[in-house]
Amino acid sequence: MSRQPKLERFNNLVKSKYQVYNSLFMTLPFHGITDTGVLLPLFDRICTRGYDKHYNPEKIVNYFFDKYQRDVSEEERYDLLFRFIQYIERQVVLFDAIEDAAYRTVNNMDGRGTLRNIKEEAEAQSKTEELKAYLQDFKIRPVLTAHPTQFYPGAVLGIINDLSKAINENNVEMIKKLLSQLGKTPFFKKEKPTPYDEAVSLIWYLENVFYKASSHIYNYVRQNVFKGEAFDNEVIDLGFWPGGDRDGNPFVTTEITLKVAARLRNTIIKNYYRDIRSLRRRITFVGTEEPLADLEKRLYESIFLPGDEVTVSLEELETTLLRIRKIVVERHESLFLEEIDDILNKVKMFGYHFAVLDIRQDSRVHMHVMEEIVKQCAKDNLGIFPDNYLELSEEEQIKVLQDVKGSVDPSTLQDDIARKTLESIYAMQDIQKQNGERSCNRY
């Protein structure tokens, strides 16, 4: 049987399933769901026709109520419109879950542009060495940016994940329960999310999507392109803005930046802990049990015990895994070696930082900040800058800054923006001490 075109696969596996499960969603015994599901297509049709005729929104909405809901009060009108929004939000989630479940079938995962295709083309054209040379320098940086309107709350993300799994397994009973959960789960909190809340929501993607996907790509390159040869390039370098993006966001404070960095470190250690636990089920050989158990214990302590200090350094984690790897190769026929290599590759890619926390600030702010710092240094007689620094030309100021040495206490600065900007510089140093140099090295 020939493979269906992509559009047909999409229609069969996404569109048709959406129609079936949306019908199931309409039958759930919740207040107003059935009425909302019946009236929404009518409202959609009237909106489309009204838009084509260049009617304004008020005229379109009034026409709908005059035709289908003539006797309802104004409060009931608002209630129905609000239920339309709630219903559509959940339809979008349902569609996302179905699309995620069908992604590997709808899309050709080995087709043109994929890693496998590039590798095979290079081999066919005898250009494998050129591909290796290119990959030694090639790097991408997916950056998760801070846009609170563009992501779901954690509870909804969990439902999408579980719903996709249930759809893949055709588990109708579980799908029905998850749709019921979806109908009862609020999508928005009454309070506006803080920058830290935004960061936590995006860290969910790092923990549940990028962690596995990035390592899968990296493992493929090491195993199938380099095949045991030296390969020191991480290929994927994740970036992260929430908690560090001060450009236009007055709510991002130094405390939040430090808190987000700690959350990133805690999350990656948690992922390592899970992997080590899974590894212990496979690496059960003489000489490996004790060091693995010790790693698991100390990673657990680093996650759950109070305090910011980790009980196992990144270097120690990597060294211990390499020692275990050597034992498995030399004494145990390299059994489950790929699982050890998988964790080692993750440690190389993510360190203790997970993603690079970018500190961002409007460049125009820095002129003002420098002026405030120079004035405060003069007031405190620190002797860091020449007395006439502010009168110097830009070129002369640059020469001074190249040789300037000294330390300024941010708390002495009277200007709020200047103080917070300088605090963010010191915060970068603290983050690098805790999470490693790669954790926060871009301003």
Where are these regions (language model features)?
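Extended, compositionally biased accessory segments flanking or bridging domains
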Residues: 403-404
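C-terminal amphipathic alpha-helical interaction region
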Residues: 408-430, 435-443
